[in-house]
């Protein structure tokens, strides 16, 4: 036998080991980025995700159903940062909402539907859009475009998990007129992702389903949002500990029914700094705890974008969050920065 025989056999053995490892090793797919589909989808679900994305990016015109009142010409025109399904902070991404609140009336919240509310559009295919009527007890609110990443997980939370947390820091579920629990929207005014997503076609673009957009295209858009991945988060055990220590996790619950949402999906009274408009049973100072999803991708903070930083957003919290803010302020400067750094990484 030649001297090269054992060496050749060793090389072949090494090659076979490498090939076996490649064949049996789990996929090393990179973590999902903003706008990517979540892991574990079937081929059929991935197909619906891609087809839904195409509808999400479709530009509408008056000839294809836009109007007569509208805020923008496509879903992605507002939800575009840093990818389709993201947030928006340009002037044309800001909505104006208005309603009238009177605690002595029944119902207490008048959403001004007879006047074109509660969403007052900035564009009309002809003439001028309705203006907010002058009125006593009027609340006007600005709304930035919130990201849609990971919203499909909210649909997976059972009502019982939301109701079980009622009373924690004064939170309460938003019971809708039909008895269901609201969970979507800044005031938790919609019960399902289906309703929340399809309503946007009418509220933002004046597009009626199924007369101006097919029911199938509407459902594809819902599935696109449902299958959007939760953006990856930065690991920070020390920051997470301080986040819990000051009590932020009392409302921004890290896992609700095992979904990593950082919300309790309850309404909380956040004090006069947050007062603007009512919606359904939600009073002007009450807001659903915002899920802390994709915070690192945001440019402005809070429902109206007034906060330029996470620290400013924390300090504007009042009402049922006052004690939490006080504990945050009692931290050392380094500890406060650690909490901010943690939230910025979510």
List each model region and its residues.
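Periplasmic c-type cytochrome electron-transfer domains
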Residues: 22-346
